[in-house]
Amino acid sequence: MALPCTSMSLVRCREHLLSLQLRCRGLRQRIVQADPETTIACWCTPSDLEDPQKPALLLIHGFGGSSTWQWGKQIKSLRKHFRLFLPDLVFFGKSFTVSQHRSEIFQAEMIASAMEAMGIKSYNVLGISYGGFVAFRLAHIFQERVEKVVIVSSGICMSPRDMEELLARGNVKKVPELFVPETHAAVKDLLRLSFVKPPPLLCSFIIDDVIQNMYGTHRKELKELLEALQKREDEEALPTLPQKVLIIWGDQDGVFPLNLAHQLKKHLGENANLAVIEHASHAVHLEKPVEFTEIVLKFFLHDGV
């Protein structure tokens, strides 16, 4: 039998280890038919092993890989209090569609459909970065299903000027060049903007591995997701949300600066609170996992910040 880490891909080896970690935490991956054209892969606890009285919590990842990559430091603490659902967004991990829809609204609709197919009628939601855009739309469209919302490091209120400044910080001309990197320089710039202390300088073969195995499979479609997101921001007025919302941000976010968190809070009004974590950047849940998780639990369990 072939090993899961063949062809000397450190990315694939790491992904395999992270999958084992999730399994050790009691999660299993399901493939759910969201609609006739779309399948959603989702890590969750088997229903026969979980207390049905626990509230459900949906965790929506960003562009830094599938759900397998992003929540390892939160699972142990969150699983004590929630039935967890970690879906892969469409074109990430094992989720796929033949549909031509690319908007964050489509992503939200597919996640909602997958949750319904799994028998989950109501849930809390937490989304980070691109996942925060999806969580926002999910909470707006499916208000009767979504209870509380946490949005992390998501530039939902970006203006054209904010976009220009992001491109300048990332040394790119278009957004997909930064978030779907194809060059060594782009990978390094993305890490620089995402972490206060970026990982040590990577060897060339590791960067090549990241480019190929984290972004190579659906590169065209991933770029289209970002283009659709940017187009919708330019065309539509942003709705508000009726749910209680917690906004979490790193004070040194290099992707979406802290002023965007304050703008989002102002837009959402009295329903929203903001928690700023010091000495953290865009990947705040990875840089400050203990503080981040404590804030999340306090909000979901006690309405605190």
Predicted regions and their residues:
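Conserved alpha/beta-hydrolase catalytic His-Asp/Glu region
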Residues: 160-168, 178-242
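Flexible "cap/lid" loop of the alpha/beta hydrolase fold
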Residues: 136-141, 145-182
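Catalytic active-site module of serine/aspartate enzymes centered on a nucleophile-bearing elbow/loop
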Residues: 270-305
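Conserved acidic catalytic loop of the alpha/beta-hydrolase fold
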Residues: 105-123
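Short beta-strand/loop motif that positions the catalytic acidic residue
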Residues: 241-242, 247-249, 253
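Alpha/beta-hydrolase fold catalytic core
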Residues: 1-57, 80-82, 301-305
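Conserved HGGG/HGGXW glycine-rich cap/lid loop of the alpha/beta-hydrolase fold
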Residues: 44-96
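Short alpha-helix in the alpha/beta-hydrolase fold that links the catalytic acid
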Residues: 243, 257-266
